[in-house]
A protein has these predicted regions:
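Residue-level preference for short coil/turn positions at secondary-structure junctions
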Residues: 5-6, 49, 82-84
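Residue-level signature of the cytosolic catalytic core of signaling kinases
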Residues: 14, 18, 37, 92-96
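Hydrophobic hinge/microswitch elements
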Residues: 20-74
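C-terminal effector-binding regulatory domain of bacterial HTH transcription factors
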Residues: 28, 60-69, 79-131
């Protein structure tokens, strides 16, 4: 039977956080994969996968519609999904406008609610990995 490592892989460009997460995952699995191409955006990678040019590791947030529409599917693999942390950053000493300060306060006070409302749909994909 066809193995995942037999498929060509589509990568993001060097320096991309998506590529770094993908390479760390592949290395942790001990896989040797064939790189088919490198593209400069998650959208380009997604469209290449939809076109049948290979497979990839992608952020769930970028493929929500395609998963719902059935255009893409997730292959359950132990170790996936890879989780990463994001941070809100700004220039040190920056004076915020009143609107920016209010938005930052909203994010700080409501982050768990915002995350729950916007990203809860992802939870169904976190337990799909094969044993």
């Amino acid at each position: 039977p066809l193995q995942l490592t037999d498929l060509p892989f589509i990568y993001r460009e060097p320096g991309s956080a998506t590529r770094r997460a993908m390479e760390e995952f592949i290395h942790a699995q001990g896989w040797s994969v064939r790189k088919r191409m490198e593209l400069t955006s998650n959208e380009a990678v997604k469209q290449a996968v939809i076109a049948g040019l290979g497979c990839s590791v992608m952020p769930l947030i970028g493929i929500k519609k395609e998963l719902a529409d059935g255009d893409l599917k997730i292959i359950p693999v132990k170790g996936l999904p890879v989780t990463t942390s994001w941070n809100l950053i700004w220039l040190q000493g920056k004076q915020f406008s009143p609107a920016a300060a209010a938005y930052l306060q909203h994010l700080r006070s409501s982050k768990h609610t915002v995350i729950g409302n916007r990203f809860r749909w992802m939870e169904s994909y976190f337990n799909q990995a094969s044993p």
